[in-house]
């Protein structure tokens, strides 16, 4: 195979460390399938030893994917490595990612180990991992704050023990492009190996240089880039993989190497992660933001109309942004709807299409044109409600007095059982959320509430995102409906359901 830049996606592991992001089991599977469709080389599916839930997710992903390598994270602990092996053993290409911190501040304050003890641990655990895995990746955590001589010693020890991939994490986003690229040059020149070693870059965005550092690493000899979709991750996030992939494509004249990313799946992948994570993509976000291909200046508009390349270095179609969609309407039939689903890349069973078509007709009766974004919302909303353990069955609101509202909420469980309660509050939303809290017998704190319109216009569907805290645990919820209050109620129920399914029904799973 011709040499290319490997894309190592850690959206489901490092990306899920974003505050408030808790993907469900089903969401992780759907994300994994879409990432494979997008064309990532390796998917870091999770940290199997951290919890039973994480183990089961990694195991399910390993059994599901057909072309993408599945990797699990492990500390320098044999039990961690054993967990990765058990979780990924049915993957088509299993990999393990072993790490230990190497910087002075981590050795002194976190590990309380000497440099010699760290070297011994690297040798012991990388060689142990090599007994089970053909591909072993080693990461010296906080590498960019590690003295270069010791970093070289750690890397050489890992290679001697059997590591085939060396990842250099800029764990706290401390480095800058010139410095980071130079680290790779020094390492590739200093280490010795009888077999091919792939160097990998893992950058955080604390100083806003994660993508620039990743590209500098390629110039320094890296052939694998790690990151997340939309750059999600703890603190300021990780390197945005869609930006890396497009930079390699657009500037192949400079880098000379491309990724194997299916660029046309980029926007769809970004939208999926945004919806499940509950994190809106900024309008001015490179590649996938709403303004990425917009031109406000009259001079720019005139130039683009005369010749697109005057102000655009890539086309919207390249990343899967459809600018020539033909909207459906209330007169559109089942065949036209089925063809639209197919054109949008969905493979949906005929019996499921019947339900979706009914929802489409309900929306078409309320608005003149049903756009592609409406169709996406119908499908994702339907999938979300189908997999939900609780659904909104009925909502009634009534004005009481002095600004107080009364809300009656009826919720149906998956087993058919119905729960109902009522409450009052200073406004409709407060009343609704108080009633839901009473149903679930939870004292939840609402910390974020956001309404997005699925499309433009007064007849748009509302997509509500909420973040709540229950028992010091932060969870998110999504609700879609033409009625903003119903969408708000659905989102709040969804957040409660996520907490219950992840932290109560599976009590003891997470650590």
Swiss-Prot record:
Reaction catalysed by this enzyme: 3-methyl-2-oxobutanoate + acetyl-CoA + H2O = (2S)-2-isopropylmalate + CoA + H(+)
Localization annotation: Cytoplasm
The entry's keywords: Amino-acid biosynthesis, Branched-chain amino acid biosynthesis, Cytoplasm, Leucine biosynthesis, Manganese, Metal-binding, Transferase
EC code: 2.3.3.13
Taxonomy of the source species: Bacteria, Bacillati, Bacillota, Bacilli, Bacillales
Cofactor(s) of this protein: Mn(2+)
Gene Ontology, cellular component aspect: cytoplasm
Residue span of region Regulatory domain: 391-511
Protein family per UniProt: Belongs to the alpha-IPM synthase/homocitrate synthase family. LeuA type 1 subfamily.
Pathway stated in the Swiss-Prot or TrEMBL entry: Amino-acid biosynthesis; L-leucine biosynthesis; L-leucine from 3-methyl-2-oxobutanoate: step 1/4
Molecular function (Gene Ontology), one example: manganese ion binding
Name recorded for this polypeptide: 2-isopropylmalate synthase
Disulfide bonds: none
Assembly and binders: Homodimer.
List of residues binding Mn(2+): 14, 202, 204, 238
Function per UniProt: Catalyzes the condensation of the acetyl group of acetyl-CoA with 3-methyl-2-oxobutanoate (2-ketoisovalerate) to form 3-carboxy-3-hydroxy-4-methylpentanoate (2-isopropylmalate).
BP terms from Gene Ontology: L-leucine biosynthetic process
Domain Pyruvate carboxyltransferase residue range list: 5-267
